[in-house]
UniProtKB/Swiss-Prot annotation:
Plays a role in the expression of late transcripts bridging viral DNA replication and late gene expression during infection. Functions concordantly with UL87 to initiate transcription from over half of all active viral promoters in late infection, without affecting host transcription. Acts on and binds to viral early-late and late kinetic-class promoters. Belongs to the herpesviridae UL79 family. The keyword S-adenosyl-L-methionine does not apply. Residues 243-273 are annotated as: Disordered. This is Protein UL79. InterPro entries: Herpes_UL79 (IPR004290). It holds the Pfam family Herpes_UL79. The keyword Cell division does not apply. One of its GO terms (cellular component) is host cell viral assembly compartment. It is found in: Host nucleus. It comes from Human cytomegalovirus (strain Merlin) (HHV-5). Its main location: host cell. Keywords: Host nucleus. The lineage of its organism: Viruses, Duplodnaviria, Heunggongvirae, Peploviricota, Herviviricetes. Residues 245-261 have a biased composition (Basic residues).
Length: 295
């Protein structure tokens, strides 16, 4: 599913913006148009909604694997605990302790930690690929809802628990937990919608289904402040004729007599007054490494 088709001449492409060409697949073009316009997820058909969610889950899955691999490579040959735990948030350790208690229900951890012989025996047991791999999978699934199965080579590494702690404190880890926990909740729909937008366009560009011209990155870097994905979406809407520089704002008296449904905040203001206080707090927690367990 992640195979690139950028260099495949048999894949027809259509211009979808001044800086973008997209493969001429009707379903992809239809979803891209809805994503670029920021339509509520409820406006997508069931087939489209399943595809968007599957892509988001797939990208979270691959992203967590890549991050854990990166941290494992960074920790190779390091034996200083102060260095290994430099990027590990404090709330990670109580969660890891509870996970270890469930993995070894009959083990006295207090005695094992302060006794060198028992500690060495416990370390040998943790180095077993099946045991450590299961520990990693359960920990990630418990906190993100994603059943990520990591390769045995990662699980066999002696510093894997420190690498897992760095992964736990990463923003992508919290974003995955936020996405899986609040998917389908109406109060969080505007925030989930923004995540789906970014993930969708990242998927199209990463797999070669959307080709971006090189000058787009130069223009975006000097004239745009909200990122390449928002830049491409605005270009997409401008090309399709759906981008308004001056969005219509009804008069307050008109707003009192017109309530077609639950309001949705603008794309550029996800934490507006349309969101519930709980949704705003959850969104702010995504930027706080010490609150990863609250997401």
């Amino acid at each position: 599913m992640m195979a690139r088709d950028e260099e495949n001449p048999a894949v027809p492409r259509v211009r979808t913006g001044k800086f973008s060409f997209t493969c001429a697949n009707h379903l992809i073009l239809q979803i891209s148009e809805k994503m670029s316009r920021g339509q509520p997820l409820s406006s997508l058909r069931l087939e489209e909604l399943k595809i968007v969610r599957l892509i988001c889950v797939l990208l979270f899955h691959r992203g967590l694997e890549t991050l854990l691999l990166r941290e494992t490579m960074n920790n190779l040959g390091v034996s200083d605990h102060a260095v290994l735990s430099r990027k590990t948030p404090q709330p990670y350790w109580p969660h890891l302790y509870r996970e270890l208690r469930q993995a070894f229900p009959g083990l006295d951890f207090e005695a094992a930690v302060f006794d060198e012989t028992r500690a060495a025996r416990l370390s040998q047991r943790l180095c077993h690929p099946r045991l450590s791999g299961g520990l990693l999978t359960r920990f990630v699934q418990r906190h993100t809802g994603l059943p990520v199965v990591f390769p045995e080579d990662l699980a066999r590494n002696g510093n894997i628990l420190f690498s897992l702690g760095t992964l736990y404190g990463h923003r992508l880890f919290r974003l995955a937990a936020f996405f899986t926990r609040h998917w389908g909740a109406e109060a969080y729909e505007p925030l989930i919608r923004i995540i789906c937008q970014k993930m969708w366009y990242f998927y199209l560009i990463g797999t070669g289904k959307m080709r971006i011209t090189p000058d787009a990155f130069d223009i975006q870097r000097s004239r745009h402040e909200t990122g390449i994905f928002t830049f491409i979406m605005e270009d997409y809407r401008t090309f399709a004729g759906t981008l308004s520089r001056h969005p219509h704002r009804p008069h307050p008296q008109q707003q009192q007599h017109h309530h077609p449904g639950p309001p949705h905040p603008p794309l550029s203001h996800p934490a507006s007054s349309c969101l519930s206080p709980e949704a705003v707090l959850a969104a702010r927690a995504l930027h706080m490494p010490t609150l990863a367990n609250d997401v």
